[in-house]
Amino acid sequence: MIAADTNVLVRLLTDDDAAQSAIARSLFLAESIWISKTVLLETAWVLRSLYGFDEAAIRGAFGKLLGLKNVEMEGKPSVAAALDLNGRGIELADAMHLSGRPPGATFVSFDKALVRRARRAGVQGVSGPALTQ
């Protein structure tokens, strides 16, 4: 099994370096691949910041990776749930936080926009912190 780093995924998804992209493709064709959540998040950041990918393009690319039989992802069900939430208007990193929480846990954030987006998307158990003194 190969644990892929961000740069391997970026080469695979952008084909921006002919030699490295060919190696990345051959790895994905020949090996079992492990992808961590942190690598996914960093890959999303690189694709958005340096390559101009929008959320839909990133979601589509990650969805294809999820569907590959030889690819295992850390927390695969929560990654799939995060991609669904992302499609409903929640930023990918926030969606990963929401989908990765333990069952029944309330997600608390000072980010009022995130709380509103989560509620609009139908996510239960999301709130701002109760401020007491």
Per-segment meaning from a language model:
Residues 1-35, 50-60, 121-133:
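Short, well-structured N-terminal submotif of metal-dependent ribonuclease cores
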Residues 7-8, 38, 112-113:
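Alpha-helix/helix-capping structural signal
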Residues 24-31, 82-86, 97-104:
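Alpha-helix C-terminal capping segments
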Residues 37-40, 59-88, 116:
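Acidic catalytic patch
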Residues 68, 85, 98-99, 103-133:
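Acidic, PIN/NYN-like endoribonuclease modules and their adjacent C-terminal/linker elements
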